[in-house]
Amino acid sequence: MLKELSRLFSLSLALIFVFSCVPKRVEIPVYEGIDVRDVLSAKNNISAIDTTFSIVFEKNDSEMRGEGVLNISRNGDLSLRVYSFGFLALAVTSEKGMIKSNPRIDRNKGKLLTQGLRDCLFWWDIQNFDVDEKDGTYLLKNFSREIWLDKKTILPIKQRVSLDDGRELHISYEDMEKMGDVWYPSKIRIELSQYSVTLRIREILFTGAV
């Protein structure tokens, strides 16, 4: 009898330890009843983003996988390094719209890795937009961008960006995570013509975050 009680007591302690070690799920805050413009403007203090991620480039039936390190400013200036099997496979910089890369990349890939990264990460930075509500979403729209947001969480679902040449960037978002006080999508896919890029964010830092 004593052995049985001792065994049950030990099992109870083990279960308490296990469940105490399980991370608590943090619920995404709900912004129902709050103006979407106020929620977005609260993020305007964010001036730069540093992030590391896994990255998959796809073109037609081919793909390349790697690990990315990115520093990007709200104005679009960026420094991107992509490593494959531990070796530097691609380096891209953009400053005041001047793009440099090693090795050279074509126009489509350049758009994906500059304007695509800027608009997908700084998704809330949209000016002079109209708001429509439909089926539990907000649609934010101006002359060059359309962003669909979840109406409760004010987090992005997808985005469409019109380029100067008439083509469009298509961006989709999944798997919301939290860093500090900022919620962000940890999986992002950007598509342009026959190209696509999928990011799985590992670490992220928001400079000037709320």
For each feature predicted by the language model, list its residue ranges:
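N-terminal leader/targeting segments and the immediate start of mature chains
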Residues: 20-69, 76-77
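Sec-dependent bacterial lipoprotein signal peptides
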Residues: 1-21
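Beta-strand elements of well-folded, non-transmembrane domains
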Residues: 55-59, 72-76, 84-86, 175-177, ...
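Acidic/charged, solvent-exposed loop-and-adjacent secondary-structure segments enriched in E/D, K/R, S/T
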Residues: 98-130
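Gly/Pro-enriched, hydrophobic low-complexity segments
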Residues: 133-210
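Extended lipid/amphipathic-ligand handling interfaces
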Residues: 68-72, 92-97, 172-178, 203-204
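Flexible beta-edge/linker motif
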Residues: 87-93, 101
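Membrane-embedded segments
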Residues: 64, 81, 85-89, 106
